[in-house]
Swiss-Prot record:
Documented EC number(s): 3.6.1.23
Catalysis performed (reactions): dUTP + H2O = dUMP + diphosphate + H(+)
Function: This enzyme is involved in nucleotide metabolism: it produces dUMP, the immediate precursor of thymidine nucleotides and it decreases the intracellular concentration of dUTP so that uracil cannot be incorporated into DNA.
Organism domain of life: Archaea
Lineage: Archaea, Methanobacteriati, Methanobacteriota, Archaeoglobi, Archaeoglobales
Protein name in the entry: Probable deoxyuridine 5'-triphosphate nucleotidohydrolase
Organism, scientific name: Archaeoglobus fulgidus (strain ATCC 49558 / DSM 4304 / JCM 9628 / NBRC 100126 / VC-16)
Length: 168
């Protein structure tokens, strides 16, 4: 396994469509990853349910938080949709980490692993810990995706979130 460099990520974007719908490629490519940006934010309006085999999985209802250029988020938990559509081959996975400025402002981003074979416009959770809240601009860079090449190709992700939000 190896973490992909910014140059390798750029080549995969150009040749294989690793990422599309980005805001500014030169700004978003980093030495060891790619910065993903904020498209929309939602308040959770209910309870979720998680089980072993997803047969009784229920996601909370959402209410979109409207914003033009900026949005103020008071302390709490939110779901956010990213601008970028990621398309991973069966030999690449990704892990996301919050950008350090977000952490220094008292907020964090929670994510799952991007499995090999996943394609979609992902959603993440934003947790605002700061008692005074946080202001986020549309297209704010909130996470850095780190891409890891697997030691060998694997069966690609086929779960319910494959293809999510591509048309939205």
């Amino acid at each position: 396994m190896a973490v992909l460099s910014g140059d390798e990520i750029r080549k995969l974007i150009q040749k294989e469509g690793l990422i599309r719908d980005y805001v500014d490629l030169e700004t978003q490519i980093q030495p060891n990853g790619f910065d993903c940006t904020l498209r929309s934010v939602y308040r959770l309006r209910g309870c979720g349910r998680v089980d072993f085999d997803n047969s009784r999985r229920e996601l909370p209802e959402l209410e979109e938080v409207e914003f033009r250029d900026w949005v103020y988020l008071p302390k709490g938990v939110y779901r956010a949709k990213l601008n970028e559509v990621v398309r991973l081959g069966n030999d690449i996975m990704a892990i996301a980490r919050p950008r350090s400025t977000l952490i220094r402002c008292g907020a964090n981003v929670l994510t799952a692993v991007w499995d090999a074979g996943y394609e979609g416009r992902s959603e993440v959770s934003i947790v605002v810990h700061n008692d005074y809240g946080i202001w986020l601009s549309r297209n704010a860079r909130i996470i850095q995706l780190v891409f890891i090449r697997l030691s060998s190709p694997t069966k690609g992700y086929e779960g319910v979130y494959k293809g999510e939000n591509i048309d939205s």
